[in-house]
C-alpha cells in the first residue's frame, strides 16, 4: 500500500511519506476489526479513529483515515479512494507519516485501512522545527 500511496502522491508532485509504527499498528487493527464476522463497516468501530490511535500511543497532531472493502488489491483500493474527494484529500494531504492495514474476512472479502498523521511539533508549538509543519497549518487543513 505504501507504494500506491507514494505513486499517487508523486503523480501530483508530492513527497513520499514515511511509515510510522503506531499508525501501521492502528491501521492493521482497524482492518482486522472491520473483517470480523458481523462487524459494521464504519470509522466508528473500536471507538473511532482518535480513540484507536490514542490507545496505541499516538502522540501526533493531525490524523486522517481511509477505509475500503471488496477490492482484491491495494492498487484497486487506491483507484477507488482517488475517485472520492475526501479519500483523495487524505492521500494528497500534508500528513508526513502513514500506516496501512489489510485483512481478509472468513468469506474472502478484503478490508483495507490507511492512517495518516504528523507528529506534534516541538519547541512551544509556534512553528515546528526539524522540517515539521506549523500547528496553524493543521488547523487550516482540518477546517477545509
Residue ranges of model-derived segments:
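A short alpha-helix/helix-coil micro-patch that ends at or immediately precedes a cysteine
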Residues: 1-37
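Flexible, active-site-adjacent loop/turn segments at secondary-structure boundaries
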Residues: 17, 21, 39, 51, ...
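Disulfide-stabilized extracellular recognition modules
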Residues: 60, 68-144
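Short, surface-exposed glycine/acidic/tryptophan-bearing loops
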Residues: 24-72
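Short, solvent-exposed loop/turn elements at domain surfaces
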Residues: 11, 36, 41, 77, ...
Amino acid at each position: 500500500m505504501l507504494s500506491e500511496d507514494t505513486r499517487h502522491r508523486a503523480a501530483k508532485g508530492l513527497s513520499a511519506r514515511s511509515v510510522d509504527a503506531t499508525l501501521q499498528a492502528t491501521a492493521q487493527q482497524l482492518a482486522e476489526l472491520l473483517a470480523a464476522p458481523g462487524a459494521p463497516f464504519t470509522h466508528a468501530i473500536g471507538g473511532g479513529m482518535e480513540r484507536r490511535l490514542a490507545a496505541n500511543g499516538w502522540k501526533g497532531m493531525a490524523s486522517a483515515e481511509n477505509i475500503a472493502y471488496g477490492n482484491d488489491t491495494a492498487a484497486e483500493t487506491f483507484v477507488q479512494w482517488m475517485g472520492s474527494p475526501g479519500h483523495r484529500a487524505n492521500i494528497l494531504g500534508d500528513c508526513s507519516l502513514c500506516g496501512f492495514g489489510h485483512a481478509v474476512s472468513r468469506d474472502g472479502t478484503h478490508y483495507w485501512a490507511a492512517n495518516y498523521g504528523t507528529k506534534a511539533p516541538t519547541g512551544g508549538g509556534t512553528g515546528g522545527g526539524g522540517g515539521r509543519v506549523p500547528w496553524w497549518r493543521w488547523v487550516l487543513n482540518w477546517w477545509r
